[in-house]
């Protein structure tokens, strides 16, 4: 096999469609390492032009019409996936009872992390009725969730906070899969509101 320097390989890979990238991961350890690296993921996110729609459920029942400018990514999940999800730089965080799921729609890679050992908060859930199905409108256990990228070390992190009946704040490092505990903020967060990550900081609306 002709040797090609890694930098040149990365430039070639950037111009390939997703199906080719997924297939080329199996060619060699070197190629897989390049295609799964942070730098490649960031560069591909910047050059990606097509809009993506993440569809959760049974592919045969989805009613989207195909368009050249839209790329569909299908994720087969149970009803827990209908709860609110969080996004950051192309990644999707889907909390579920007992688990934190982080999905990369571009590569179809899904990582699952168990909740921290200290997860013992009662899980009363807010629900609403829609087409004879119960859909969750808050995160598991009424935790307030946040998802973003640490601007200091570049790792993606999931933050969750609870204010009743106990006050807790926990952070999951997606790189290591480890949980850490922090002091909760002085003010309650508005239940049901999603967070947003801007320049490495996560923001919520607070109760007044």
UniProtKB/Swiss-Prot annotation:
Every F-box domain range: 1-44
Top-level division of the source organism's lineage: Eukaryota
Kelch repeats: 149-200
Entry keyword set: Kelch repeat
Ranges in a coiled coil: none
Tagged with keyword Ribonucleoprotein: no
Keyword S-adenosyl-L-methionine listed: no
Name of the protein this chain belongs to: F-box/kelch-repeat protein At2g43270
